[in-house]
Amino acid sequence: MASTVSVQPGRIRILKKGSWQPLDQTVGPVVYWMFRDQRLKDNWALIHAVDLANRTNAPVAVVFNLFDQFLDAKARQLGFMLKGLRQLHHQIDSLQIPFFLLQGDAKETIPNFLTECGASHLVTDFSPLREIRRCKDEVVKRTSDSLAIHEVDAHNVVPMWAASSKLEYSARTIRGKINKLLPDYLIEFPKLEPPKKKWTGMMDKKLVDWDSLIDKVVREGAEVPEIEWCVPGEDAGIEVLMGNKDGFLTKRLKNYSTDRNNPIKPKALSGLSPYLHFGQVSAQRCALEARKVRSTSPQAVDTFLEELIVRRELSDNFCYYQPHYDSLKGAWEWARKSLMDHASDKREHIYSLEQLEKGLTADPLWNASQLEMVYQGKMHGFMRMYWAKKILEWTKGPEEALSISIYLNNKYEIDGRDPSGYVGCMWSICGVHDQGWKERPVFGKIRYMNYAGCKRKFNVDSYISYVKSLVSVTKKKRKAEEQLTRDSVDPKITIV
């Protein structure tokens, strides 16, 4: 039986009403423009698109637009994303829903596709980031008034606009609002069945040469190579969450609340951030499964849900309601004034972007954190705070510090260009979602962190050794791969 399950109205925003059509009248297809939530299962936007199609007896398709160098993403991020999409393409085919990959400026490709297929409805993902919102606004303007456009927040457990209608000051101010709505939104997903009506047109555009596309993207973005520690795709994400071998909830959960802030115990972390960032796993699925095992480790589950739901959704809130989410202008007034009062304070060291990027500072702990990010694609969460605060201490002023931290985060982190990444930099450097602390040079009233504090918290030498070993192994692997590539391009010919 085809899916007829409706999504809660509070999860949907109507961006354009479109023309009313009688139920017995043939209408155009429903198109789901996927971008932030790249999965088949547990996807409210796809569920809504199929439901719309079934209620209007129309076919449904999924389109994904590949932006040209979106926010300077490199092989590391694009390779991971495209390999996940390749898997998704095959999975969606099993439901007899066509998947179309478009390339270019979405402001042009999406309206053109909608016109060509005669769509009646467009369903889109939600993102708080300005580039996506501007693009979506243009798509709304450039499409026919007869087309209905619905935006679905399938990324957050509680939809961003339902959780709060304003910029929240801290986790404390949004936590109660989210928890109050969890009974309404933290519910099990319905099973997604094939749509009633099959898609028949434009099948020539459905073919995607994934191997060639991935090879091209990886080659062009080789400055930041792919990583091996996390396998892309929806299946891999679920395995990391709850696999029998090394799943977070099944094997590693009990140490989360006690060890998650210890950089020499990276296995205590969930390892889910790449999958959550690309939408290959639903945060709601993670929360549902975590609740099932709460009796075994209540403190660990509660801590995990705080990070997974409250902190992540606070980041979306900030990026949506604060247009200057990546600028000193976005800091609270007390923090901005304090930082500017101390902007001209003498710094012990001033490092260039190149020195910072290569980890060439006088602080071996900071260098290790930077190299962990460069070579592993994931800096430990505790070290991210120390890392960003030291950039504030070692650059000419807070604006430069924020700019450099965001640039490096977006370039090297597998989950870069995420609201949580922007907010992490803003918290560390600009005191966003934090309070004022004892005033001191350079930092003003921004929370201070130093080497001695880290040394009291964990074994600094062990962390530095761990990163050195990681870098050495990674370099050897890359050198061997590069030699293999050279040999395949220019093989040595033996004359007998």
Swiss-Prot record:
Its main location: nucleus. DNA binds at E307. Residues 28-160 form the Photolyase/cryptochrome alpha/beta domain. Keywords: DNA damage, DNA repair, DNA-binding, FAD, Flavoprotein, Lyase, Nucleotide-binding, Nucleus. Its EC number is 4.1.99.3. It is an enzyme of class 4 (lyase). GO terms for biological process: photoreactive repair; UV protection. It catalyses: cyclobutadipyrimidine (in DNA) = 2 pyrimidine residues (in DNA). PROSITE patterns: DNA_PHOTOLYASES_2_1, DNA_PHOTOLYASES_2_2, PHR_CRY_ALPHA_BETA. NCBIfam families: phr2. This is Deoxyribodipyrimidine photo-lyase. It comes from Arabidopsis thaliana. The gene is PHR1.
